[in-house]
Amino acid sequence: MEHIRVGEYEIRLMPSVVDRYFYGFARGVVDFINRSYFQAKVVGKETIPSAPFILAPTHRSNLDTLMMGSVYRPRLRYMGKDSLWKKKFAGEVLAALGGFPVARGTADREALNACVAVLKSGQPLVLFPEGTRREGDVVEDLMDGAAYIGLKTGAPIVPIGIAGSDRAMGKGVKVPHPKRCVVVIKPPISTLIDGQVASKVPRSKVNEITDELRKSMQEAYDEAKFRL
């Protein structure tokens, strides 16, 4: 089975049979909790294209990752803090759930290459373009990784706004509160240039797509907030 290397870690590129069953069970549990405990509502699922694609949600709470379990049924891939992989068992569980490690605060070339490999293998990827949890209702400057990876692979980027997750589980909160959450999905942003995957990624195009993504994420967040 093919693996991808990120730092000291080696992660399976494609899921094993056990991974698929484990992810399906875990996603079902998460979706049930989202809909029952958080009364989660998802708007715009019909706009999600065929895989591979990049889901690009706003990030106000640790719950945002779990909300993705109600957005898309098949297995998603995520980046996570490399410190979470320090314990072998935890790393195996996270890998089965679609995670792979990234060193926070560094220009991690291996992590970028891993994202490209995931998308080129036909799997969908979740990236938080804000980079870390933010506060407030304004989607400010984004990191340009989503645009770069999208251009590198031709994968469309799906802007998502999540409202209510910060009320349910803000920074420092250990036990989530049963507050309503709304997820709004906007139409995908194409990363093709003249209908083709870019042979070379132009900085101007990265900036253009990043700005378009920021505006669309803001619209999605505002709509989600309105629907709370």
Regions found by a protein language model. Name each.
Residues 2-43, 47, 87-97:
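A transmembrane-helix-recognition feature enriched in membrane-embedded lipid enzymes
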Residues 1-21, 110-228:
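Non-catalytic C-terminal accessory region of glycerolipid acyltransferases
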